[in-house]
Curated annotation (Swiss-Prot):
Reactions catalysed, as given in the entry: 5,6-dimethylbenzimidazole + nicotinate beta-D-ribonucleotide = alpha-ribazole 5'-phosphate + nicotinate + H(+)
Record-annotated membrane-spanning stretches: none
Similarity remark: Belongs to the CobT family.
EC number: 2.4.2.21
Protein name: Nicotinate-nucleotide--dimethylbenzimidazole phosphoribosyltransferase
Keywords: Cobalamin biosynthesis, Glycosyltransferase, Transferase
GO molecular function: nicotinate-nucleotide-dimethylbenzimidazole phosphoribosyltransferase activity
Length: 354
């Protein structure tokens, strides 16, 4: 299993940054004052560099929502019971969740991926059954996943990204569903980005002060219990992560091999992206962070990564909802880049020199 991961990581290459010079010159020649479209120009330039195409294409979009259960839910860190995970998966498959609405209006295909739900799903349209295990272990007592299970989940995500690239999708998005998954996400941020546990840990699905303090204590205990496993990114992901978080990390890795940009959703998806960045720093150039999550600590994570999320709407749902919204902004940015006239082609006079 480890050899498969090494081969995947070796295949990831940094994009050609020289394309940024050509793309910036094109943006500056569009019929507008330089920089007047603000972040749209930055997004378009990043998309050109990531895809390696000076004439970028963005027509087909796909979101994969990865689902998994967490053993640490037994510690009472969430306001909702674990059985909500499969219930919400069924809701998504029936078209009733927020991500269904937002993905549809973004023109994005949606797949729900079972990588670790503690439930047996029948064959259903829109569901990809890729179960690694029936939920992770309780990370406050032992490692959440074994190394082989972690690599298995990573490869599930990577293979789905490659399949999407081969099917002709131009932009991918991440989503997740898993009761208690803000707990492993916060633990991963605390260790990988060296953020104090009390700073990074938030209220998740809306827990009160007493349960928040308990959640902080559980995360501290998990870090202490698994201390011997935290010397490497893979060991940290295995000890403190979850199957859907590992699959998101793999999704990022696989997409980066194929030079397909990925829109990262919120707090939990960012944990998967950060794990991928620690496994292969080159993936950073293929990522768009969709929004600043309402979950406590996400702003600090973005500052640590020196990244600016596209949207700030106080979203804290997950599922890929922020990613679906941001896809429309990215598409608008690419359309501006491709479809606006240039000063030279339109016969419009440029800015006069004073």
């Amino acid at each position: 299993m480890r050899q498969k991961l090494e081969e995947l990581l070796t295949a990831i290459q940094s994009p050609d940054r020289s394309l940024a010079i050509v793309a910036q010159a094109h943006l500056d020649d569009l019929t507008k004052p330089k920089g007047s479209l603000g972040c749209l120009e930055e997004i378009a330039l990043s998309y050109v560099v990531a895809t390696g195409r000076i004439k970028p294409v963005l027509e087909r979009k796909k979101i994969c929502c990865f689902a998994g259960d967490h053993g640490v839910a037994a510690e009472g860190v969430s306001a909702f019971p674990p059985e909500v995970t499969p219930q919400m998966v069924y809701n998504m498959l029936n078209g009733g969740a927020a991500i269904n609405v937002l993905a549809r209006h973004a023109g994005a295909e949606l797949s729900v991926v079972d990588v670790g739900v503690n439930h047996d799903f029948p064959d259903l349209p829109g569901l990809l059954r890729r179960k690694v295990r029936y939920g992770s272990r309780n990370m406050s007592l032992e490692p959440a996943m074994s190394e082989n299970e972690t690599i298995h989940a990573l490869m599930v995500g990577a293979e789905l990204a490659r399949d999407a690239a081969l099917a002709g999708f131009h932009l991918l998005g991440t989503g997740e569903m898993g009761i208690a998954n803000t707990t492993p996400a916060a633990a991963l941020f605390a260790v990988l980005l060296d953020i104090p546990v009390e700073t990074i840990t938030g209220r998740g699905t809306g827990i009160d002060d007493a349960r928040l303090n308990h959640k902080i204590a559980v995360i501290r205990k998990a870090i202490k219990v698994n201390e011997a496993s935290l010397s490497t990114p893979l060991g940290t992901l295995a000890a403190l992560g979850g199957y859907e978080i590992a699959a998101i990390a793999g999704f990022v890795l696989g997409a980066s091999v194929c030079r397909v940009p990925v829109v990262i959703d919120g707090f939990i998806s960012t944990a998967g992206a950060v794990a991928a960045m620690f496994l292969s720093p080159a993936v950073a150039d293929y990522l768009f962070f969709s929004h600043l999550s309402g979950e406590q600590g996400h702003r600090i994570v973005m500052e640590k990564l020196a990244r600016k999320p596209i949207l700030d709407l106080d979203l804290r749902l997950g599922e890929g909802t922020g990613g679906a919204l941001a896809m429309r902004i990215i598409e608008a940015s690419v359309n501006v880049y491709n479809e606006m006239q240039t000063f030279s082609s339109a016969g419009v006079s440029g800015k006069t020199e004073e």
